[in-house]
């Protein structure tokens, strides 16, 4: 037990006063954070988050427009004075002009 075993990543030698001595393993030394891999991950995550925020903004705008369309269509009552008639103003004017033409022809 005079040589520390570096393959396990730590040594438990108590003779010289150290209880736990850590050594880098092959897995931790093979990953180099300065290689640019980590910066690529940050770029991809930032692109994903910005696209997600853009889609959320488009969804909010679409829901606002839909809310405005629904509220504007419900602000006009369904002609309560006409007893449930569903004629528009243009159709009512067209019918009244046809009646006046018919009354002029019949007299």
UniProtKB/Swiss-Prot annotation:
Keywords: Membrane, Transmembrane, Transmembrane helix
Compartments, record wording: Membrane
Protein name as annotated: Serine-rich and transmembrane domain-containing protein 1
Keyword Transmembrane: yes
Main subcellular localisation: membrane
Originating species: Homo sapiens (Human)
Keyword Disulfide bond: no
Membrane-spanning intervals of the chain: 43-63
Xref: InterPro entries: SERTM
CC annotations in GO: intracellular membrane-bounded organelle; membrane
Membrane topology value: Single-pass membrane protein
Domain of life: Eukaryota
Pfam families per the UniProt record, alphabetical: SRTM1
């Amino acid at each position: 037990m005079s040589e520390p075993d570096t393959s396990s990543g730590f040594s438990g030698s108590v003779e010289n006063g150290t209880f736990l001595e850590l050594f880098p393993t092959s897995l931790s030394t093979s990953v180099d954070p300065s290689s640019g891999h980590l910066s690529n991950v940050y770029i991809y995550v930032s692109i994903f988050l910005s696209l997600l925020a853009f889609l959320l903004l488009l969804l909010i705008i679409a829901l606002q427009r839909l809310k405005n369309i629904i509220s504007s269509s419900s602000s006009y009552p369904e002609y309560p004075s006409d007893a449930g008639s569903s004629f528009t103003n243009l159709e009512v004017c067209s019918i009244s002009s046809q009646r006046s033409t018919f009354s002029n022809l019949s007299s």
